[in-house]
Amino acid sequence: MGKKLSNLDYLRIKKNIIKRLYSNKAFSKGHLLYERLTSGIPPHLAGFVNHVLDDLIKEGLVIHYGRTKYGDAYQLNVQKLKEIEEIIS
């Protein structure tokens, strides 16, 4: 059986993903590849990024931009900018 993700680690990964997208200005015109999102997360938590990213998409904070020739790309939902800025601060 696999390791479970604690609530604190879940929030850390969530904040890290949103911060990275926000700092790279990945809004309506920009996007960020999956590999770039996972690069700042510790190796023992890297397996949980997909789970957290799926939850962010369900919440509507992150949008799946599409597949590029380099991999999956993601961007922030501009309509939920206030919620995103609350999470970051």
Regions found by a protein language model. Give the residues of each.
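Alpha-helix N-cap/helix-initiation sites
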Residues: 10-11, 27-31, 46, 67
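Short acidic, hydrophobic short linear motifs in intrinsically disordered regions
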Residues: 27-41
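Short alpha-helical segments that sit at the start of domains
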Residues: 1-24
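Short amphipathic alpha-helical interaction segments
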Residues: 42-58
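Short, amphipathic alpha-helical interaction segments positioned at domain boundaries
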Residues: 78-89
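Minor-groove-contacting beta-hairpin "wing" of winged helix-turn-helix DNA-binding domains
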Residues: 68-76
